[in-house]
Structure formats: C-alpha cells, structure tokens
C-alpha cells in the first residue's frame, strides 16, 4: 500500500540503521529519545529490554508516524552488562564473558500512527572462547567496544571471540530483523 505513514527510528545506533537498510527499510527520520534506563528492582533482563524499547517508542515525538525503538541488554545470569563506561569496565566485561555463555536480549517496539504499541523481546545465547589478557587489551585499545552493550560488538573484531550462537544474529547486533519487519507489517507499515 503506497502512502504509508513515515517511519521514525528512535535510536542513535548506526548499527540499527544499517540493519534496517539490509531489508530495504530506510527511516524517514532518526530521532533518538532520552529516557531513564535504570533497571527496576526484580526486573529481569528480558523485562528490562522490552520496557526500555516500549518507553523509547512512546517518548518519541512523532505524531502520525510509525516509530521503531529497540534496546539491547547483555546478561550474564541476572547481571546486566550495559555499555561500558570506560576502557577498564570494557576489559572487566570481557573478562567476565571469557569462556562463558551469556544472553543478548533485544527488545523491539513499534508505535503505530494511532498510538498503539506492539513489542517483542528476542533472545540469543552467545558463547565466547577463553580470552587472553593480550586479546582483551588489543580489543579494548581498538575502541570497538564503545557504545555497545556488554562492551563488545559481534559484527566487528569481537566476532572472532564467539564460538557459538543460538538465536538471532541480528538481535545480538541490536535489531532482530525478522521480528522487526513482522511488527511493522502487522501494524500496516509499507515501504
């Protein structure tokens, strides 16, 4: 159906923009939202990812448009590994993940022009090889960890640390494409 309402991406992530382009979706505008991303008491990583995606979609000022928002949480058990604040924290995160399996949960939410919000959480399990201190130091020095949940980006050099994935690769990168396309189309969005 030509003439679909515009699509706003409520995210500053260049990776999400690149992922959307892979499936032929180019947002009409990028408008990151600023919300409180503090984890609530007893909130699971899945609940956190979903809530943040929904709140970002709701907070975007885009009347009459579709709004797409997402949030990725890296969890080791019930511990969230957010975006590393500095090189020391990035190295600490990599030491924690070294030789272990962890979860990447991406919550994706779409707000229709009517205001209706639909959302889904997509979970992937990632296993990392045991990392040497030299590998950790080199990766941290590269700066590739900046702005990435868990202090690493699977689509870059850290992809060489991953021994197994169970689930959606694009959810690990930051936007599960199959689920995103399904949510958009389910609400009537057409390119």
From Swiss-Prot:
A biological process from GO: nucleotide metabolic process
A matching Pfam family: Maf
Listed Gene3D superfamilies: 3.90.950.10
GO MF annotations in UniProt: dTTP diphosphatase activity; UTP diphosphatase activity
A GO cellular component annotation in the UniProt record: cytoplasm
CDD domains xrefs: Maf (cd00555)
Segments crossing the lipid bilayer: none
Catalytic reaction equation(s): dTTP + H2O = dTMP + diphosphate + H(+); UTP + H2O = UMP + diphosphate + H(+)
Active site: 71
Enzyme class name: hydrolase
UniProt site positions, description: Important for substrate specificity: 15, 72, 155
Keywords: Cytoplasm, Hydrolase, Nucleotide metabolism
Enzyme Commission (EC) number: 3.6.1.9
Required cofactor names: a divalent metal cation
Main function: Nucleoside triphosphate pyrophosphatase that hydrolyzes dTTP and UTP. May have a dual role in cell division arrest and in preventing the incorporation of modified nucleotides into cellular nucleic acids.
Family stated for the protein in its record: Belongs to the Maf family. YhdE subfamily.
HAMAP family assigned to the protein according to its UniProt record, in alphabetical order: Maf
Name used for this protein in its record: dTTP/UTP pyrophosphatase
Native organism: Hyphomonas neptunium (strain ATCC 15444)
């Amino acid at each position: 159906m030509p003439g679909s309402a515009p699509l706003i991406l409520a995210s500053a992530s260049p990776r999400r923009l690149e992922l959307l382009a892979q499936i032929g979706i180019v947002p009409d505008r990028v408008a990151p939202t600023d919300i409180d991303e503090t984890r609530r008491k007893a909130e699971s990583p899945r609940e956190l990812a979903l809530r943040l995606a929904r709140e970002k979609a709701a907070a975007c000022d885009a009347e009459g448009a579709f709004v797409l928002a997402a949030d990725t949480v890296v969890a080791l058990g019930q511990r969230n590994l957010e975006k590393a604040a500095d090189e020391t924290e990035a190295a600490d995160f990599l030491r924690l993940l070294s030789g272990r399996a962890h979860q990447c949960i991406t919550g994706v939410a779409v707000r229709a022009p009517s205001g209706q919000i639909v959302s889904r959480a997509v979970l992937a399990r990632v296993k990392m090889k045991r990392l040497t201190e030299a590998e950790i130091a080199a990766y941290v020095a590269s700066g590739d960890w900046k702005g990435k949940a868990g202090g690493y980006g699977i689509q870059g050099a850290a992809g060489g640390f991953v021994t197994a994935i169970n689930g959606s690769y694009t959810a690990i990168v930051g936007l599960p494409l199959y689920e995103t396309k399904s949510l958009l189309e389910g609400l009537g969005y057409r390119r």
